[in-house]
Amino acid sequence: MTIAAAIDSRKAGAPARSKTSRIARVDIISDLTEAEAIWRELETRQLATPYQRFDLLSAWQQEVGPREGAKPFIVIATDNDRRPLALLPLALRHQHGVRTATFMGGKHATFNMVLWDKDFARDASAADLAALLRGLRAKDAVDMLALTQQPRHWQDYLNPLAMLPRQRSVNDCPVLTIVPGDPPTNRISNSFRRRLKSKERKLQSEGYRYHLADSDADIERLLNWFFRVKPMRMAEQKLPDVFAEPGVEAFIRKACRAPITGGGHVIDIHALECDDEVIAIYAGVADGHRFSMMFNTYTMSARSRYSPGMILMRHIIDHHAERRYRAIDLGIGADEYKRLFCKGDESIFDSFIPLTFRGRIAALAMSGLNRAKRLVKHNQVLLRLAQRLRRVFR
């Protein structure tokens, strides 16, 4: 089936719309500075996740992208009046002779999404997506789009790229849905709250407190602690330390310091502290609708037995519920602690879109590989076998 036919099949049953696309022009920009004004303007009327903020992805591109061989590949679609309708925040990599465009942010973005003009996204059609892909093919600058970890819906809007051929992502994302005004026990049960309160009382005599970092000095101090403790936690779990990869620490520090309009930072840091020690931090992105965790760790000291990470998570949930947020997620993956708070799953998908013959071969390979990974991740027998093999060859 061709991509055009696949788009049409996904639109079957939808209200009839014009066969004429509103996209009149597709441009590719390889300079963040050149794209910044349009990007920031779209942010004010966007449909996208907080992971697509310019200040977050520009920090990643400046500090991490070059070290991964990723160059800015920012696609902007405009109408006849040169009004921006969509901005694809992509990075171009050359892998095995294939020019592949992926979302900026790499493994540090839980969700990837195009920045859409909301009015355009609401009525996006098969003709619009076909025009976007046609414009990219005409540029002959990329063989394949590897668009992974996209939410199918965001803020009650359907993600227009869900009309393209897609498959479920390797991992799901546990999510807690919050109904504004509901009692706290609808978010976290009474019995679980009592267990956490009992642990919390044991910390009260030690100057225990929860806070959201709001000054540069606080942010710097908490990040210094994180980058000292996290490697020990990763080593304890026999996991690779992704935060030690080139450029990652500089990226995170830059994004955590960057303020956003209305208060807060591009990455917010929530912390639990005692008089003489940080005992847990959770850091993530927020947009007034949803808080999404990016990274966390907790103390290596004896205070870890009081479950400071769990206590902090309860504070974060209540903090955002009081501000009428509608959802909280703890990142991709099915870690057991996430299920204690997040009972639902976010529907996320991958799309591998070939634009050339070479891209078609690569898209088939990447699609098949990700399907195999998902099969292993969601089959306990295969997962245990894979984990044993990983330990043998580590």
In which residue ranges do the predicted regions lie?
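A conserved beta-strand-loop-helix scaffold within acyl/acetyltransferase catalytic domains
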Residues: 24-81, 85-101, 150-170, 186-304
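A gly/proline- and charged-residue-enriched helix-loop-helix capping module
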Residues: 106-141
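Active-site/acyl-donor-binding loops of N-acyltransferases
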Residues: 2-25, 32, 151-185, 323-388, ...
